Design a protein with these regions (language model features):
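Intrinsically disordered, low-complexity terminal regions
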Residues: 1-252
Length: 252
């Protein structure tokens, strides 16, 4: 069964709140926005998505939330959203147990709150803020000026071109591979393995605060007080390790 909604109004902000299933977000060549929900035959119509457009903001909600308390989350459904190009400026996505695929995005701001499930991102996002609990998160060919990642008990591998990176990692393993030199890096990790890979560069100053755990660095550095300085030392890195491992690696 397929439920399709076509939205002609101008939408600059998208807010999505969704549970289980596959969620895909893409751009298409049309000036309108399309929401397509596919379900099995037994899916009750009263639980089809709810949407509302107000002042350029589109809200899409999963109506199955109401029945979750009864444990009736057997109704399988997938969601695909087709966005017009050069229109959406910001997106807020909350997914619980869903597999999110948002590819080729061209937006200013993306906020994602992702609980379990898998997430794959690509495209150009100026400011990207991700919070993930128990999730698996990855990206390819992703360009982000600011990348802020709060990860708890999650695995992640983000590949792309990043400038300002802010990490808060608790448990499991997070890897960041940047094809461009970072402008700044802040990392607080607790009982986690964190790897940040950057290309050869003109220099950085890295302040390492280590309560327990291990710090490893692939770049040749000299010490200035509590700082490790590579070449001209211009870029500022701060690494706080509260157990686990942190590796600053050479991106070949």
């Amino acid at each position: 069964m397929e439920h399709t909604v076509q939205i002609e109004e101008l939408v600059v902000e998208l807010s999505l709140d969704w549970l289980l299933g596959e969620v895909r977000i893409h751009h298409h060549d049309h000036p309108y926005l399309i929401i397509r929900q596919t379900t099995n035959q037994v899916f009750p119509k009263r639980y089809l998505l709810h949407h509302q457009v107000k002042g350029g903001r589109l809200v899409i909600q999963d109506r199955r939330k109401r029945i979750f308390s009864l444990g009736l989350h057997l109704y399988q459904t997938d969601l695909t959203i087709y966005l017009p190009k050069n229109q959406i400026q910001s997106m807020s996505i909350r997914c619980k147990g869903a597999n999110l695929q948002a590819e080729g995005l061209r937006v200013e701001n993306v906020y994602g709150h992702l609980t379990s499930g898998k997430t794959m991102l690509s495209g150009e996002i100026k400011h990207l803020l991700l919070e993930t609990v128990g999730g698996l998160i990855s990206s390819r060919q992703l360009a982000a000026q600011t990348l802020s990642l709060h990860a708890t008990s999650s695995k992640g591998e983000l590949m792309g071109a990043f400038s300002d990176v802010d990490l808060h990692v608790t448990g499991r393993r997070i890897q960041i591979h940047s094809t461009s030199m970072l402008h700044s890096l802040k990392s607080i990790s607790t009982g986690a393995y964190v790897k940040v890979a950057i290309p050869e560069n003109d220099g950085f100053t890295c302040y390492v605060k280590k309560r327990s755990g291990a710090f490893r660095n692939d770049f040749s550095c000299h010490r200035e007080k509590e700082n490790m300085v590579h070449k001209d030392g211009k870029r500022s890195f701060e690494v706080d390790i509260r157990g686990g491992h942190f590796l600053l690696s050479h991106q070949h």
